[in-house]
């Protein structure tokens, strides 16, 4: 029996097939119209978002997650700027980087083509609604959105604005579809609709990602939890290290590229830790190892803290004897997201870059840069922590697959 969700996905699938063959000019014009519509609907979007924010606060959601949910004028403007960046990026579809001719005269081309219908399941981050739509449209894919119930008013308003924009273009409104029923049974059904959905990308916490991986029959790409580390080596510039730690922890603690654990070389711990505590200690709860406690006091870290994605004003701090132990700690407790070393030692930097197993590895910079817009992608579908198909921020080039086209003149296989 055809369910309502199946019907919804069938319409989306048909629209995505039409979109897959559209030219770049028409897709870019559609994006331009969506940007105009978002600008026109800015006040309405912020008004609807405020309903979600008030509901979240009433339910006691922690402030770092409320901040992730909140849309401001600047954040809506940021979405619009992101669309312009995507417009300016090269179309990833129907590109051939490899063409060769076989001995029998067949010409083989490896072409990039859209994936088809991409489903994205995400928590209370309404900016994902716009990022996901724009990236899937430019890459020729339809998108099925299932946001959190905590952002339902925001998502409805954003999808309304997107569809209003599409009315002024040659792209069908049906290329975007929102599941706005909070029934969690629909998520489970969505995960098994292989006939209509080609790929599902979950964006959220460990519980959501584990649920999707466990229950999906549709192929998935995990956008993993961000237990991100900063290792401060003995040769690091201490003042620069304090600035980077503050940025990575405090700027937006509720996002996946925020720093959750700081590892400090024992030779500079006495000089660095008081400065870190002085800079962030009033705002951030520091959970330290015994060595850390002996220098700055604070709460003693427990074993679970080393594996925790706090998404809050909490940081775990551990003093380590060398770069080898820092790397071992990161590879044991990390989530393969974003890791950083602060050092003036080129050998240690290269060792860290090669041996740390993560999607993004930094030298002398904040982990906060692991982001599609910061990488110049205009946005992202998520930050993949797996190794197959896509890894790191997923922009346009990660939303296509390949098709081999073979042109002959009557060849038969002997």
Swiss-Prot record:
Report keywords, A-Z: Amino-acid biosynthesis, Cytoplasm, NADP, Oxidoreductase, Proline biosynthesis
Q: What is its EC number?
A: 1.2.1.41
Pfam entry (one): Aldedh
Q: What reaction is this protein's catalytic activity? A: L-glutamate 5-semialdehyde + phosphate + NADP(+) = L-glutamyl 5-phosphate + NADPH + H(+)
BP GO annotations: L-proline biosynthetic process
Q: Which SUPFAM superfamilies match?
A: ALDH-like
Gene Ontology, cellular component aspect: cytoplasm
Q: Which CDD domains does the entry link to?
A: ALDH_F18-19_ProA-GPR
Main subcellular location of this protein, as a coarse class: cytoplasm
Q: Quote the pathway field.
A: Amino-acid biosynthesis; L-proline biosynthesis; L-glutamate 5-semialdehyde from L-glutamate: step 2/2
Query: Which locations, inside or outside the cell, does it occupy?
Result: Cytoplasm
GO MF assignments: glutamate-5-semialdehyde dehydrogenase activity; NADP binding
What general EC class does the enzyme of this chain belong to?
A: oxidoreductase
Q: Which family does it belong to?
A: Belongs to the gamma-glutamyl phosphate reductase family.
Q: What does this protein do?
A: Catalyzes the NADPH-dependent reduction of L-glutamate 5-phosphate into L-glutamate 5-semialdehyde and phosphate. The product spontaneously undergoes cyclization to form 1-pyrroline-5-carboxylate.
Q: Which NCBIfam families match?
A: PRK00197.1, proA
Q: What is this protein called?
A: Gamma-glutamyl phosphate reductase
Query: Which gene does this sequence derive from?
Result: proA
């Amino acid at each position: 029996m055809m369910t309502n969700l199946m019907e919804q996905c069938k319409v989306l699938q048909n629209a995505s097939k039409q979109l897959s063959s559209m030219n770049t000019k028409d897709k870019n014009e559609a994006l331009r119209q969506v940007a105009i519509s978002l600008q026109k609907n800015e006040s309405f979007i912020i008004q609807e978002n405020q309903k979600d924010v008030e509901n979240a606060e009433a339910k006691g959601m922690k402030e770092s997650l409320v901040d992730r949910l909140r849309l401001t004028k600047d954040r809506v403007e940021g979405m619009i700027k992101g669309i312009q960046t995507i417009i300016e990026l090269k179309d990833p579809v129907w590109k051939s980087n490899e063409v060769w001719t076989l001995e029998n005269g067949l010409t083989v081309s490896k072409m990039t083509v859209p994936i088809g219908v991409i489903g994205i399941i995400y928590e209370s981050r309404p900016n994902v609604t716009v990022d996901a739509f724009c990236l899937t449209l430019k890459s020729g894919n339809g998108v099925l959105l299932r946001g959190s119930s905590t952002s339902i008013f925001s998502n409805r308003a954003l999808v309304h604005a997107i569809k209003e924009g599409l009315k002024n273009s040659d792209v069908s409104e049906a290329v975007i579809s929102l599941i706005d029923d909070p029934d969690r049974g629909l998520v489970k059904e969505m995960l098994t609709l292989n006939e209509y959905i080609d790929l599902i990308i979950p964006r959220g916490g460990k519980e959501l990602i584990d649920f999707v991986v466990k229950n999906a029959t549709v192929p998935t790409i995990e956008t993993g939890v961000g237990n991100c580390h900063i290792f401060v080596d003995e040769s690091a510039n201490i003042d620069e290290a304090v600035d980077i730690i503050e940025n990575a922890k405090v700027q937006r603690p509720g996002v996946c590229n925020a720093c959750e654990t700081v590892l400090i070389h024992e030779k500079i711990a006495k000089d660095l830790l008081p400065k870190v505590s002085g800079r962030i200690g009033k705002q951030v709860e520091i959970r330290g190892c015994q060595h850390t406690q002996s220098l700055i006091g604070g709460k003693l870290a427990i074993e679970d803290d080393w594996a925790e994605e706090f998404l809050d004003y909490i940081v775990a701090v551990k003093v380590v004897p060398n770069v080898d132990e820092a790397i071992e700690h990161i590879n044991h407790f990390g989530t393969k997201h974003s890791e950083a070393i602060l050092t003036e030692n080129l050998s240690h930097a290269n060792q860290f870059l090669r041996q740390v197993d993560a999607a993004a590895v930094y030298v002398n910079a904040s982990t906060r840069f692991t982001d599609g817009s910061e990488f110049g992608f205009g946005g992202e579908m998520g930050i993949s922590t797996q190794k197959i198909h896509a890894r790191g921020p997923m922009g346009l080039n990660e939303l296509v697959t390949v098709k081999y086209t073979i042109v002959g003149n009557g060849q038969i296989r002997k």
